[in-house]
């Protein structure tokens, strides 16, 4: 059999709800699908170091009124963040928790699909099941105005 790697890219809000989802090939750079996924967003977008890109940040600011906030790499100049942004950046574990629930509870990480249709059916049914969960992981005591999304 053949194995075709894929990546699931997701943007979630502070309530753990899926805002945008995209599937790409496994060898796709993480920054590539962000432009498609974030066009209708506004506010602040929190991501890990894999999303650091001056060009992406400028594009998001210009086309979607979104600010990308990431942790810095080792040899980057420190940047001053607002205290709320710093606190929210420390809650990136919310994304890992959501992906953990998608993989373990919704069983989207299944490697023996017999067809592309079976793969897509399994993925979509897992995403739909997650959307119907009554209790999703959230950031507690969220008092910030506006929408917060996390990559």
Q: Model segments located where?
A:
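Helix-centered, glycine/charged polyanion-binding patches within enzymatic domains
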Residues: 44, 49-117
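Anion-binding and metal-coordination hotspots
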Residues: 45-46, 60-67, 115, 120, ...
């Amino acid at each position: 059999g053949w194995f075709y790697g894929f990546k699931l890219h997701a943007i979630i809000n502070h309530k753990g709800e899926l805002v945008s989802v995209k599937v790409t090939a496994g060898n796709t750079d993480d920054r590539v699908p962000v432009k498609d996924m974030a066009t209708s967003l506004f506010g602040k977008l929190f991501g890990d170091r894999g999303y650091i890109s001056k060009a992406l940040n400028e594009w998001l600011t210009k086309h979607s009124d979104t600010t990308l906030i990431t942790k810095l790499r080792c040899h980057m100049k420190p940047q001053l963040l607002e205290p709320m942004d710093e606190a929210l950046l420390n809650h990136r574990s919310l994304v890992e928790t959501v992906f953990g629930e998608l993989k373990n509870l919704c069983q989207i990480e299944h490697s023996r699909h017999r067809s592309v249709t079976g793969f897509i059916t399994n993925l979509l049914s897992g995403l739909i099941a997650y959307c119907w969960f009554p209790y999703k992981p959230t950031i507690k005591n969220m008092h910030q105005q506006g929408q917060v999304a996390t990559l």
